[in-house]
Amino acid sequence: SADVAGAVIDGAGLGFDVLKTVLEALGNVKRKIAVGIDNESGRTWTAMNTYFRSGTSDIVLPHKVAHGKALLYNGQKNRGPVATGVVGVIAYSMSDGNTLAVLFSVPYDYNWYSNWWNVRVYKGQKRANQRMYEELYYHRSPFRGDNGWHSRSLGYGLKSRGFMNSSGHAILEIHVTKA
């Protein structure tokens, strides 16, 4: 399949070059993000929803992501002369009955804010919403988009490793693997 937002690709193929291609497809937008999430969890993921605190996406969240595959997604600030970034949470139901949630935050104003990201497994099925955003952004030790790799145990037999840059043209690459 093509390296475009909304696609599911082989997990081994996920990398910065693919995410840059997804990002460039958004064109000349001041605040945008390309997201790639590699499923090496041993579980199948089914899309639930994306909650946008600010910004939007023209892309439908890839519906099924099998083990060994990676999803590609994007987001951008709202069109027009509005001072917003692109901030949201993606939620996937996993075949074990739990929910994988991924936060991304690309602010408009870097004088006051930085890029942030987070990943967490919730018990049971939970759709992304404002409450989940607040929890992941303020209370669950998010990672700064600091051009470095970060790892964390997610519980439920899983761990994550991810990278986010510090630019307004952001890339977020996350690998979810068996612990």
From Swiss-Prot:
GO molecular function annotations of the record: channel activity; lipid binding; toxin activity
UniProt-annotated binding residues for an N-(acyl)-sphingosylphosphocholine 2: R53, S54, G85, Y108, Y113
Annotated stretches, region: N-terminal alpha-helix that contributes to the pore: 1-29
Binding site for an N-(acyl)-sphingosylphosphocholine 5: S114, R144
Coiled coil: none
Annotated site residue numbers, Part of the hydrophobic cavity (in subunit A) that receives Val-60 from the adjacent subunit (B): F16, W149, F163
Residues annotated as binding N-acetyl-D-glucosamine 6-sulfate: Y51, R53, Y138
Residues at which an N-(acyl)-sphingosylphosphocholine 3 binds: W116, Y137
Positions of short motif Cell attachment site, crucial for protein stability: 144-146
Temperature dependence: Stable up to about 51 degrees Celsius.
Positions of region (N-terminal region): 11-30
Gene3D superfamilies: Cytolysin/lectin (2.60.270.20)
Keyword Ion transport: yes
Residues bound to an N-(acyl)-sphingosylphosphocholine 1: R31, R79, G168
Top-level taxon of the source organism: Eukaryota
General remark: This protein has been found to bind carbohydrates, since it shows a substantial delay in elution profile in size-exclusion chromatography. The carbohydrate pocket ovelaps with the lipid-binding module of actinoporins.
Quaternary state and interactors: Octamer or nonamer in membranes. Monomer in the soluble state.
Name of the protein in its database record: DELTA-actitoxin-Afr1e
